[in-house]
Amino acid sequence: MFKKLIVLLLILSVINPIKVYATEVQNPQNTFLQMTQEELVMLQKIAVAEAHGKDEITMANIMLTILNRRQSKEFPNSIKEVITENNQFSTYPKLYNKYEPNETSIRAICLLPFIENKNQLYFENTVQGSWISTNKIYLFNINDLCFYK
């Protein structure tokens, strides 16, 4: 069922990308990916803002970071609260509302079930000596973003 939804989203994103982002992503077998329409839009907007024009793989990993935080006891348990928590995302709230879901963020949403989740909880631009880089476990780097847990 969920794979059919992903294929449908991919097809619709080519035909009519403007309307696809409002589709809810839900899979009863996988609560990790369940979200409301509002959360889906928020997840895409923050990924577009944080990725600064990077590809869908980078955006999908940013989205996974947010979804992992929602599941973690260290963070709030909703996508909205994770995104709006003070000082967590450099683009929120200042730049967040300047961005909208786009074709790349739609492709990123479609990739979520297929990308290896390394349980990342943090990401940052490649910076040596930052608080995150010295206090958290480095996992991987993609397009100049470092991911940690």
Question: Where are these predicted regions, by residue range?
Answer:
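Bacterial extracytoplasmic/cell-wall-associated proteins, especially those involved in peptidoglycan
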Residues: T23-K149
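Sec-dependent N-terminal signal peptides of Gram-positive bacterial secreted proteins and lipoproteins
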Residues: M1-A22
